Each structure stands twice: as structure tokens, then as C-alpha cells.
């Protein structure tokens, strides 16, 4: 269940995040040594790269000198927005970028990760091409995935060490990951929990109420926001992150996700799967700062739920 703040509103608004991570100087030090103490695990080459990219400021002045003499009372600021104005793509929006991570909003129809059969029309490939503008050997590292048909927020790492930190500590680092969906029919309950064992057979994920020795335990918490026009608008909170988990659990409840032909939906009024990852909150893998990202519900979702 989410450890972040619960959203009581059915219409969340995008939240802005501070532009800088700020460290207060309490004793004399050189900038390089100061940053290596404050940013656990960072290398000297990484600090030099940050300086070269002109994203480090001392008392609001960009500083590129690694041995800059800091004095008590000064503030060191690290910009958390790097060149995202240069990024434009019809299927992918760059929400946040710093030296370690990228947060993006993916449109439905785009694969998260490159595959043997599809290498270019993927979020991973698009972002690889973007980061190579800074250095030809740069690339992004996969941390988690969204189904091709699902839209919403997701995160990539910019180096292997950050990727490993995120993957190995995912359940401790991520405090809130929430989805919104439109499902068929009127939900019987305002809120509840679905638990089952999910078995992945590649083309289809099977759900079982008991452990058959092959499945992985999955837990989905849901809250019904609105019922209208034979549909229900539902917020979903994942306690586990299994393949197709939400889609299978909504089918288990007898209310398949609208547009999901694979898992029981008989209607497709939006021409897409009605599932969107609208909230992602986590502790930054390096600075340990709490990061909160939230997008509005898709406009098409709101239109379908307007009472006629």
C-alpha cells in the first residue's frame, strides 16, 4: 500500500518539484570534497561532469571550478532540470531530468523497452538518442516498465549504478505508484483489495486464488472515484508490480479495463486501453530527497465519465 500522502480528490493536479537540491555549508571546504561528502557514492568524474554541464551553483552563481573555496553560510545548489526544453517527441514527454534519472510520461501505444523485434519505436530508444546528444556513449538504463497499451509516468536511470540502486531497493525507494482506470460496469464497492497468484504464460497472465507453485503473489488496492454511463472510474494502488496485474485483477472482479480485449472487455469507446499511471513518488537514489510527480487524468477519461 502507498506510503505517501493519499489523494482524496478524483481530479489530481500536476505538482511541481523544486528546481534545485540545496546543501548548506557549515564549515570551510573545497567544492569537490563537499559534494562527495553530501552525495553518497558519487565519483569525482561524475562531479566534474556536473560542473562541466553548468548545473552546480554557489549562492545562485553557476560554478565550474572543482576546488572552489566554500565558506560557512554559503549554499550549494544542484539544478534538477537539464536541457529538457531540447526534448520533443509526440509519444513521450520529459517531465524531469537530473544527472542520475529521467522521469517521463509515455503515451499509449509505445513500448517501454526495446525488444528483439522492435528496437526503435520504444521509449528506451527515444531516450537513448536524446542522451547521446551530450555524449555519444551515453544511454539510459531500464528500471521498471509500463505495458505498451498503458500511458503514464515512468523512470529511467542514466547510469548502471543508479539502475542497480533503484532495482535492488525498489520497494523502499518508491513510496507511491498509482494508476487510474475506467472499467466496465458499476463497481460494487467504494474501495477494496484484490489478492491472487499470477502465472505468466507469455501471451496471457492467469490468476489463481491459491498458490499453484508457479504463480507470483500479487496485491492491488482500489478506490472507486465515480460511476457513470455504465462505467466506473477507479484509482489503483499496487502493492506488487506483476505483469498485467491491474488488468487481470479487474477481470477477477468482473469489471475489465475498458478497451482491454485480451482480458475480457467487450467495448472500446476510447480506442485505447483505459489505464494511466498518474502518480509516481520516490526517494531520489542519490540525494535521498522525496520526489513527487503527478499528472492529470487523461482528458478522454474525463469525457467518458461525464454524466449524460
Feature-to-residue mapping (PLM):
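RNA pseudouridine synthases
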Residues: 1-193, 197-202, 300-304
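Edge beta-strands of extracellular beta-sandwich domains
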Residues: 89-91, 257-260
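Conserved hydrophobic positions within beta-strands
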Residues: 94, 183, 221-224, 257
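The conserved catalytic core of RNA pseudouridine synthases
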Residues: 136-168, 176, 195-196, 200-253, ...
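Short, surface-exposed loop/helix-turn segments at secondary-structure junctions
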Residues: 209-210, 258-267
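Active-site-adjacent capping/gating segments
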Residues: 269-277
Amino acid at each position: 500500500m502507498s506510503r505517501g500522502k493519499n489523494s482524496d480528490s478524483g481530479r489530481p493536479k500536476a505538482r511541481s518539484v523544486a528546481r534545485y537540491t540545496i546543501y548548506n555549508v557549515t564549515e570551510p571546504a573545497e567544492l569537490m570534497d563537499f559534494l562527495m561528502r553530501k552525495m553518497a557514492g558519487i565519483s569525482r568524474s561524475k562531479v566534474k561532469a556536473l560542473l562541466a554541464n553548468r548545473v552546480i551553483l554557489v549562492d545562485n552563481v553557476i560554478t565550474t571550478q572543482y576546488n572552489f573555496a566554500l565558506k560557512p553560510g554559503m549554499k550549494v545548489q544542484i539544478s534538477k532540470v537539464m536541457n529538457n526544453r531540447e526534448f520533443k517527441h509526440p509519444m513521450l514527454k520529459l517531465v524531469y531530468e537530473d544527472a542520475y534519472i529521467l522521469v517521463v510520461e509515455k503515451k499509449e501505444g509505445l513500448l517501454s523497452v526495446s525488444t528483439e523485434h522492435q528496437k526503435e519505436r520504444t521509449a528506451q530508444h527515444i531516450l537513448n538518442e536524446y542522451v547521446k546528444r551530450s555524449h555519444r556513449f551515453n544511454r539510459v538504463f531500464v528500471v521498471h516498465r509500463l505495458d505498451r497499451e498503458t500511458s503514464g509516468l515512468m523512470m529511467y536511470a542514466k547510469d548502471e549504478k543508479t539502475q542497480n540502486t533503484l532495482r535492488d531497493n525498489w520497494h523502499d525507494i518508491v513510496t507511491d505508484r498509482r494508476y487510474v482506470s475506467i472499467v466496465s460496469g458499476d463497481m460494487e464497492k467504494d474501495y477494496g483489495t484484490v489478492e491472487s497468484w499470477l502465472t505468466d504464460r507469455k501471451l496471457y497472465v492467469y490468476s489463481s486464488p491459491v498458490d499453484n507453485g508457479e504463480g507470483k503473489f500479487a496485491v492491488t488496492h482500489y478506490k472507486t472515484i465515480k460511476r457513470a454511463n455504465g462505467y466506473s472510474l477507479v484509482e489503483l494502488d499496487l502493492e506488487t508490480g506483476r505483469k498485467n496485474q491491474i488488468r487481470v485483477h479487474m477481470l477477477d472482479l468482473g469489471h475489465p479495463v475498458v478497451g482491454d480485449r485480451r482480458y475480457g472487455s467487450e467495448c472500446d469507446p476510447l480506442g485505447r486501453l483505459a489505464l494511466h499511471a498518474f502518480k509516481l513518488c520516490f526517494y531520489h537514489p542519490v540525494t535521498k530527497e522525496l520526489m513527487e510527480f503527478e499528472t492529470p487524468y487523461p482528458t478522454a477519461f474525463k469525457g467518458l465519465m461525464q454524466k449524460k
